[in-house]
């Protein structure tokens, strides 16, 4: 897969995150979006470089596990543990761990990387101090698309969302903390946040993300 293809897959995942994110739950958008982006890129690589054939019944189980994982991620604001997944799916924890292991399919170290396909995936993971292409593509697509989307908001709306969801910051901020920054009440910040998120969901605002679906 070419690097730009990975970027495109990551942005498709980001668009899904924007569409499905429920801000009222109070969790960081960056955490939720990163999960979707990583899943989209990983799935794309696996589709192009599968080395082990998974039985149909196991694929169905993996799909169910992924679906429930997304639900629990939205509910808890973090990825669920195998123990939590086992409880929700009414399955033994050891079976959950087995499914998770199978889902992480081995990727051939000979998988071509780059426009000229003269490099291979193995070339990029020999030095563990370097960032993997997958992580690099995830980070770049999230930064780029998020910047473009927020640029369509007013300066105040964009700053409120950046502070609330920890975008380009070390941590997110509470309604009270953001309110102090703007010298307004927490309720006013809640209103600004809600209005900004409604704008992001409008087709005219999400065009920058939807364009990545066009061939």
UniProtKB/Swiss-Prot annotation:
Pfam families: Sigma70_r2, Sigma70_r3, Sigma70_r4. SUPFAM superfamilies: Sigma2 domain of RNA polymerase sigma factors, Sigma3 and sigma4 domains of RNA polymerase sigma factors. Residues 60-136 are annotated as: Sigma-70 factor domain-3. Residues 1-51 are annotated as: Sigma-70 factor domain-2. PANTHER family: RNA POLYMERASE SIGMA FACTOR RPO, RNA POLYMERASE SIGMA FACTOR RPOD. Belongs to the sigma-70 factor family. RpoD/SigA subfamily. This is RNA polymerase sigma factor RpoD. The lineage of its organism: Bacteria, Pseudomonadati, Pseudomonadota, Gammaproteobacteria, Enterobacterales.
